Amino acid sequence: MTDRIAAVKTYLLDLQDRICAALEAEDGKARFAEDAWERPAGGGGRTRVIGDGALIEKGGVNFSHVFGDSLPPSASAHRPELAGRGFQALGVSLVIHPENPHVPTSHANVRFFCAEKAGEEPVWWFGGGFDLTPYYASEEDCVHWHRVARDACAPFGADVYPRYKEWCDRYFHLKHRNEPRGIGGLFFDDLNQWDFDTCFAFIRAIGDAYIDAYLPIVQRRKHTPFDERQREFQAYRRGRYVEFNLVFDRGTLFGLQSGGRTESILMSLPPQVRWGYDWKPEPGSEEARLTEYFLTDRDWLAGQP
């Protein structure tokens, strides 16, 4: 697996570079600061953070490559046969929180796991996806986001996008709120249904599609005027983001349980957030429309070319 792991690592480092360059160019003011780190138990990474920009209030694009003698519980709980195997985990994970409430928060992740044991075949899989969390949503943006996701999946089978779109809707669901985190996109894990080269090609297609999915939305919305009321609603909705990441997110749990770097793991949290007791938007308002129309696990491409 050594050559394969090296190829995945080369791609992920290049992907991090390309995404950071594209986001810096779009912001036009802020620059990513890099923090290279090492994990005492094995491995390390490159954390890149950005903030206080013309567009991005807070964001991060992280690369990590960690390894150890046994998988943490979050990774082996649904695959107990992997308990006791040594592992390597590589990935790029990013979250972008724009200041303007009309520009959605975006998240993307592509990752590779390999679990090995002497005398046995290695077990490997890929995971990843991308999802969008709007505050003042636009149907045009939702359709675009999902169209790019569908087109990235298309060369790998007509059933791939619907299956991973539904998985995304199911995964990014706040059970205690009974509502989605956002308007979804793609999510998949344990991907080894094809040969390695095909799975790796799929991961590259998804990683490369993120900028094509996100930047046109940013460009359409970043100059939309906003007021303090809309910023307050954004902070309220960001609370849902925090709740999901700290309670349900498998990547967060894996990082914390495997002795990962806390600052990098919690990089995904927004800079300002608020909770109000039993707060509800005014009926018929833009804020109410978010949950009533957009956060409903819709088929955004129904009737679309």
UniProtKB/Swiss-Prot annotation:
Report the top EC class in one word.
oxidoreductase
Which molecular function terms from Gene Ontology are attached?
Answer: coproporphyrinogen oxidase activity; metal ion binding; protein homodimerization activity
PROSITE patterns from the xrefs?
Answer: COPROGEN_OXIDASE
One family name in Pfam for this protein: Coprogen_oxidas
Q: Where is this site: Important for dimerization?
A: H176
- Is the keyword Metal-binding in the record? yes
- List the InterPro entries: Coprogen_oxidase_aer (IPR001260), Coprogen_oxidase_aer_sf (IPR036406), Coprogen_oxidase_CS (IPR018375)
Q: How does it assemble?
A: Homodimer.
Tell me which UniProt keywords the record has, alphabetically: Cytoplasm, Heme biosynthesis, Metal-binding, Oxidoreductase, Porphyrin biosynthesis
Q: Where is the protein found, in the record's own terms?
A: Cytoplasm
Documented EC number(s): 1.3.3.3
**Which residues are noted in the entry as substrate-binding?**
S93, N109, V110, R111, G259, G260, R261
Note down the stretches annotated as region Important for dimerization: 241-276
Q: Which reaction does it catalyse?
A: coproporphyrinogen III + O2 + 2 H(+) = protoporphyrinogen IX + 2 CO2 + 2 H2O
- Family statement: Belongs to the aerobic coproporphyrinogen-III oxidase family.
Against SUPFAM superfamilies, the record matches this protein to: Coproporphyrinogen III oxidase
Taxonomic superkingdom: Bacteria
**What's the protein called, per UniProt?**
Oxygen-dependent coproporphyrinogen-III oxidase
Describe the function of this protein. Involved in the heme biosynthesis. Catalyzes the aerobic oxidative decarboxylation of propionate groups of rings A and B of coproporphyrinogen-III to yield the vinyl groups in protoporphyrinogen-IX.
Q: Tell me the route in metabolism or biology where this protein functions.
A: Porphyrin-containing compound metabolism; protoporphyrin-IX biosynthesis; protoporphyrinogen-IX from coproporphyrinogen-III (O2 route): step 1/1
- Predominant location: cytoplasm
Q: Which cofactor does it need?
A: a divalent metal cation
